């Protein structure tokens, strides 16, 4: 018997897979970006966020409707808008007013976010200008410090690095001066002056130091032609010894004339540093006991002669606003 031949109606075997195009051949399928007519950058979330924030800045009172924003930005998937709002809300830049509206924080009625940004730019420009001026001042300061250093280190100028009593009196003409040399940390207090019985104010100065002694000099000059009168405060004991010919009552005019006749004191003590140190204390006998007695007995003598402390210990403390004068029953003199 002859074998049966295959019929012509049999289906051919299907192909496995289409072979990829050769390397370098152009693709037959156009990209989705070109087919849609827009690039991938235009559909990115970053660009969409920039446009969304611009709408938020231009919105009245900073309130933006999300549906209107989606229509304006032509966003088909509203999920992308919600992704942006979730991030902004997470960093506390916006808050939800309702289900479909948000508001930029810190924007009140009648205020626009764009105006705030313009104001911020002006402030930044002002800060840059101030920083430029600060750098110029710092440069000027460095130049001055270097100039002072050059002057002080010069061997010729070193001999003149001191101030005389005459120089100080010329700066404060007609005033009674107290030159104070005190350690660092000294507390200075000037209470409010009180009116005396004669209508003049009573002035006080309280000094307190915990680290060292305080030295005070009284510097006075009656006229431009006279020499400065300088002696320590309080005066030494040898200057305040009672004289056999002391006067019991001296008028203020006599006290003034006596002050003009005081001998000249040494006033040119040098200093190798910038600190202004008072001149050396006057030697004993430079001011006669008669003149000191006349000054102390007058009504205008600015120094207080305190009585000796009692033999018993002092069992009380002074407050921070109290001074040594509070330990004695004395009347404050008028200056």
Curated annotation (Swiss-Prot):
Pfam families: E2F_CC-MB, E2F_TDP. The keyword DNA-binding applies. One of its GO terms (biological process) is cell projection organization. It is found in: Nucleus. A motif (DEF box) lies at residues 71-108. The keyword Transcription regulation applies. Residues 277-335 are annotated as: Transactivation. Residues 109-205 are annotated as: Dimerization. Keywords: Activator, Cilium biogenesis/degradation, DNA-binding, Nucleus, Transcription, Transcription regulation. Residues 1-18, 238-256 have a biased composition (Low complexity). Residues 1-40, 226-285 are annotated as: Disordered. SMART domains: E2F_TDP. One of its GO terms (molecular function) is DNA-binding transcription activator activity. Residues 37-108 bind DNA. Residues 66-88 are annotated as: Leucine-zipper. GO terms for cellular component: cytoplasm; fibrillar center; nuclear envelope; nucleoplasm; nucleus; transcription regulator complex. InterPro entries: E2F (IPR015633), E2F-DP_heterodim (IPR037241), E2F_CC-MB (IPR032198), E2F_WHTH_DNA-bd_dom (IPR003316), WH-like_DNA-bd_sf (IPR036388), WH_DNA-bd_sf (IPR036390). Residues 312-329 are annotated as: RBL2 association. Belongs to the E2F/DP family. Transcriptional activator that binds to E2F sites, these sites are present in the promoter of many genes whose products are involved in cell proliferation. May mediate growth factor-initiated signal transduction. It is likely involved in the early responses of resting cells to growth factor stimulation. Specifically required for multiciliate cell differentiation: together with MCIDAS and E2F5, binds and activate genes required for centriole biogenesis. Component of the DRTF1/E2F transcription factor complex. Binds cooperatively with DP-1 to E2F sites. Interaction with retinoblastoma protein RB1 or proteins RBL1 and RBL2 inhibits the E2F transactivation domain. Component of the DREAM complex (also named LINC complex) at least composed of E2F4, E2F5, LIN9, LIN37, LIN52, LIN54, MYBL1, MYBL2, RBL1, RBL2, RBBP4, TFDP1 and TFDP2. The complex exists in quiescent cells where it represses cell cycle-dependent genes. It dissociates in S phase when LIN9, LIN37, LIN52 and LIN54 form a subcomplex that binds to MYBL2. This is Transcription factor E2F5. It comes from Mus musculus (Mouse). The lineage of its organism: Eukaryota, Metazoa, Chordata, Craniata, Vertebrata. The gene is E2f5.
């Amino acid at each position: 018997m002859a074998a049966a031949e295959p019929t012509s109606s049999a289906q051919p075997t299907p192909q496995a897979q289409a072979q990829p195009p050769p390397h370098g051949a152009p693709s037959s399928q156009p990209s989705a970006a070109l087919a849609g007519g827009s690039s991938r950058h235009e559909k990115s979330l970053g660009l969409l966020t920039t446009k969304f924030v611009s709408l938020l800045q231009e919105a009245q009172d900073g309130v933006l409707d999300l549906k209107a924003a989606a229509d304006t930005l032509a966003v088909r998937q509203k999920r992308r808008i919600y992704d942006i709002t979730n991030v902004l809300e997470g960093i506390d830049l916006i808050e939800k007013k309702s289900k479909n509206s948000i508001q930029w924080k810190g924007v009140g009625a009648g205020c626009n976010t764009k105006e705030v940004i313009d104001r911020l730019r002006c402030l930044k420009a002002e800060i840059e200008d101030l920083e430029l001026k600060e750098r110029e001042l710092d440069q000027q300061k460095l130049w001055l410090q270097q100039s002072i250093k050059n002057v002080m280190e010069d061997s010729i100028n070193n001999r003149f690095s001191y101030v005389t009593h005459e120089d100080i009196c010329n700066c404060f003409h007609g005033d009674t001066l107290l030159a104070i040399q005190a350690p660092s940390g000294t507390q200075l207090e000037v209470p409010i002056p009180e009116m005396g019985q004669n209508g003049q104010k009573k002035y006080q100065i309280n000094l307190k130091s915990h680290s060292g002694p305080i030295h005070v000099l009284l510097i006075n000059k009656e006229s431009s032609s006279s020499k400065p009168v300088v002696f320590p405060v309080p005066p030494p004991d040898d200057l305040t010894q009672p004289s056999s010919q002391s006067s019991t009552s001296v008028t203020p005019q006599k006290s003034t004339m006596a002050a003009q006749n005081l001998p000249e004191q040494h006033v040119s003590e040098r200093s190798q540093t910038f600190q202004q140190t008072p001149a050396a204390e006057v030697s004993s006998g430079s001011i006669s006991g008669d003149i000191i007695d006349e000054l102390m007995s007058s009504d205008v003598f600015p120094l207080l002669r305190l009585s000796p402390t009692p033999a018993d210990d002092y069992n009380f403390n002074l407050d921070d606003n109290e001074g040594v004068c509070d330990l004695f029953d004395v009347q404050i003199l008028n200056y």
